[in-house]
Design a protein with these regions (language model features):
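Short, glycine-biased loop/turn motifs at secondary-structure junctions and
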Residues: 1-95
């Protein structure tokens, strides 16, 4: 399993709403920018895709199927993740 960070606005990305402790899975091979659950390996890297604002929520995730995960060096895309926790402390974001 791989640990990563997923940024959202109010726990939502497109039509998907995320909850702490829940798993999310699609039965397809992930494709960057098309389908799957996108995340970054570094917490601060998420700011490239989601600029900080009052609705910004940073989630620590586990990639539960890293064998099918695809990457472009900046972000990764999986077909199966689990939301571990919300990171509310800004100091954790910039480490």
């Amino acid at each position: 399993m791989t640990k990563g960070y997923k940024a959202t606005y109010n726990y939502q990305c497109k039509t998907q709403i995320y909850e702490i402790g829940q798993e999310y899975k699609i039965d397809q091979i992930p494709i960057l920018c098309q389908r799957g659950f996108h995340y970054c390996l570094g917490a601060k890297d998420t700011l490239y895709y989601y600029p900080f604002n009052p609705k910004f929520k940073l989630l620590e995730i586990e990639d539960l199927n890293p064998n099918d995960t695809v990457t472009d060096r900046h972000k990764l895309c999986s077909n199966h993740i689990k939301i571990i926790r919300e990171i509310a402390d800004p100091d954790e974001l910039i480490q």
